[in-house]
Every structure is written in C-alpha cells, then in structure tokens.
C-alpha cells in the first residue's frame, strides 16, 4: 500500500461503465439447438448500464507505484526513445513533489486485492535544468528538438532549443497523466497541490523548485484527413482535440508549440486509436512551452470550465 504521508481526498467522481450490447436476435426460424444458444447469448449479452461512485485520493508517490506510473508514461511516450524506467525511478526518488491518484481506502468495489494499489493517474515535475546530464532527461529534450526539426520551421526549432538549453531559466517538464475513464475534475486539485509543493521546494531549497518555463507534452487528436505538420495557429487549434481537457488551457497560454504525429507508434489501445462521431482520428503529440508566470491564469480558466 502506498504511503499515507500525503493523502488528500479528491472530489468523488461518478463514472459510467457501459457494457455494449452485442448482436440483436437473428430473424427467421432456427433449429431448436440454435434457439437455445441464442437465448443463452441474449441473457449474457443484455445491455447493462451501471453507475459506479469512486472516491479518489492523492498519495505520496512510492515504490509500490512503479508499475502503474510506468504504464501511464508508456501511453504518453509510446515508442519514443525515452528511458521511462529511469524516469519512473526519478519521480519516485523526488517524491516531495507529485502525487499518485488511487481509489480511496475503504471502497470494496473490487474483489481483486491486486487492484488495491492501482494507479489511476500521476502528476509530477522533472526539472530538466537541474537534472541536466541524466539520460532520460537528455532523451526527452532530444525527442522534442528532433520532432520540432522534422515538423517546423527553423525559427521555431531555435526557440525551443534556446529555452531548453538556457541554464539561467530552468525548465520543468510537467507530467500529468491519467487513464481516459478518470474525469477532468480531478486535474484541478492535482495541479493546485503540485504548485504548492513546488513553492515549498523553492522556499526550502529542495530540488524541482523554481521554474521559468513548463514543458508539456500533450496527447492530442485530429481528424485523419487534416494535416498536423508544423507550428499550430488558431485554425489548427480548433481542429485539435485534447485527451486531457485541461491541456487546452495550457495550449492557449503557450509561448510556442507544435504538433507531431504518433500514428505509426500507436499500435496499442494505450496509444489511443480514437474515433469521435465515427470520424477517424489521427493521434498526435503537442509540445508546448508555457511561462510559469501564466500558471495562475491557466488555473482560473480551468475553474471557469468546470463551473459551467
């Protein structure tokens, strides 16, 4: 069980689990054996709409969360050359910041003890400037710069390169990942708590304190018929769909940003072969650099979004 040193109750969220109804009964006369099979299948495949109340709590990241965090990072990086095992270890080592989101204790919706420590989401930050030279950190920077070179004009590449390699203005890689069935409401208290922890770290001279910029890598989608290459403007923004709703507010406040396709890497369900309203969607990643001073206004926008 994860450490209870930093348990924070989050608002209970109502999740709707739907089990799809299979096929309708076949018309026409069937043999007696076929009728019996059809009756059995009809009973088994009857549509069930079940509402499940789940209370989430935020816990201090611990060794027990290793597999769960690694799985969440895998859905972000897919097949990119980033050592997510090392990155996961780093998040665990610096657990004075960040949270693992799990089901609240005392709920018995599952009979499987193995699910007791299931990680539904994680939020943390890696200070790329402080961790300069660490393999996974250098790989993250190389990933962003190489994809930028492949998809953007040289001026944008130079902007990203300058910010990522300016030791006088630290850059924090902001990680906020969760599974798709976890509602967006959970993200606001997670981000607010992280900002408090970062402020405390700066005040006490602990790692990951002051950041001038946040680097965010967001899971986004676009209609398969649209182009995603290059830097993105207002028209492209309207065509983007965000896996994490709050990422749109970071996008709006970003200093620079660009998209790149991960369609060739998304060969698993975690990668997200999505469709909306029967329209095939192309999976992307959107890289953003957001000035830290804009975080308060981003959180305000997110509050407005949740209040509607």
Swiss-Prot record:
GO BP field: DNA repair; microtubule anchoring; microtubule cytoskeleton organization; mitotic spindle assembly; mitotic spindle organization
Biased composition (Basic and acidic residues): 8-21
Keyword Coiled coil appears in the UniProt entry: no
Protein keywords: Cell cycle, Cytoplasm, Cytoskeleton, DNA damage, DNA repair, Nucleus
Residue ranges with Acidic residues bias: 22-53
Cellular localization per UniProt: Nucleus; Cytoplasm, Cytoskeleton, Microtubule organizing center, Centrosome, Centriole; Cytoplasm, Cytoskeleton, Spindle pole
Annotated segments matching region Disordered: 1-53
Disulfide bridge partners, by residue number: none
Superkingdom classification of source: Eukaryota
Coiled coil: none
GO cellular component term of the entry, any: centrosome
UniProt keyword DNA repair present: yes
Entry function: During interphase, required for microtubule organizing and anchoring activities. During mitosis, required for the organization and stabilization of the spindle pole. May promote cell cycle arrest and DNA repair.
Family: Belongs to the BCP1 family.
Protein name: Protein BCCIP homolog
Taxonomic placement: Eukaryota, Metazoa, Chordata, Craniata, Vertebrata
């Amino acid at each position: 069980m994860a450490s209870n040193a930093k348990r924070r109750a989050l608002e209970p969220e109502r999740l709707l689990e739907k089990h799809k109804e299979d096929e309708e009964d076949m018309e026409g006369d069937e043999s007696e054996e076929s009728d019996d099979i059809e009756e059995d299948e009809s009973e088994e495949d009857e549509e069930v709409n079940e509402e499940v109340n789940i209370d989430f709590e935020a816990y201090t990241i611990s060794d027990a969360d290793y597999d769960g965090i690694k799985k969440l990072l895998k859905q972000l990086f897919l097949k990119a050359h980033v050592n997510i095992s090392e990155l996961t270890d780093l998040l665990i080592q610096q657990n004075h910041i960040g949270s693992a989101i799990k089901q609240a204790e005392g709920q018995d919706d599952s009979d499987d003890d193995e699910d007791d420590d299931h990680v539904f989401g994680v939020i943390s930050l890696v200070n790329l400037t402080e961790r300069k030279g660490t393999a996974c950190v250098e790989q993250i920077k190389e990933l962003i710069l190489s994809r930028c070179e492949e998809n953007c004009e040289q001026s944008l590449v130079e902007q990203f390169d300058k910010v990522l390699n300016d030791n006088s203005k630290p850059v924090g890689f902001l990680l906020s990942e969760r599974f798709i069935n976890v509602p967006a409401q959970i993200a606001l208290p997670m981000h607010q708590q992280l900002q408090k922890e970062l402020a405390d770290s700066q005040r006490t001279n602990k790692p990951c304190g002051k950041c001038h910029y946040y680097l965010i890598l967001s899971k986004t989608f676009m209609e398969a018929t649209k182009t995603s290459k290059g830097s993105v403007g207002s028209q492209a923004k309207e065509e983007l769909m965000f896996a994490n709703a709050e990422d749109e507010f970071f996008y709006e406040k970003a200093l620079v940003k660009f998209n790149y396709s991960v369609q060739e890497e998304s060969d698993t369900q975690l990668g997200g072969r999505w469709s909306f309203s029967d329209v095939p969607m192309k999976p992307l990643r959107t890289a953003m650099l957001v000035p830290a001073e804009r975080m308060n206004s981003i959180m305000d926008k997110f509050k407005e979004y949740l209040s509607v």
